[in-house]
Amino acid sequence: DGLMLGNVLGEEFLTWLWFQSDVAPGAFVNKEGQPFSVSMEQRIVVQGGEGDTRETASVAGTLSPLTEARFGLGKGKKVTRATIRMEKDELAFQFTLSADDFTLGSMKLPKVEKPEEDDDPDAMLLERFYLMEVCLGLLESLYASFLRLRLSAAWGETVQEITAWIRRE
């Protein structure tokens, strides 16, 4: 079953990430081998068709299993954008990722404590930069894991598992 062959890597990545986060949300590790969890949150956009026949379905819901979007995958639509939540230790990051150009949007970082009066005035800004770097590092490790799998002989089996997951109610 060539479910994903010939598709854009970004669409495959988001589909794989949704699958993995659904079946094993805590099975991710960063470059240092430290575990973190991933979940698809609140909103997924799937598209199918070409030109004038292009259809888009945007599924949103705070605690929704996003069944309609998964149904769209079963009908040949592809994940084009998703809201992703990553948690490592006490840090939680949330952002929207676009499949076509890997654009990040609506990034929510962990709260940063307001500096004391005698602290460095740039401390808060530097802390936010650091948190963005942590978030991007986690995302980079996810994509590296995906690419290792995608370029391996195990990818065919993974496609079968994803297909079964899509068809599951």
Predicted features along the sequence, with ranges:
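Intrinsically disordered, low-complexity, charge-rich terminal extensions
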Residues: 1-169
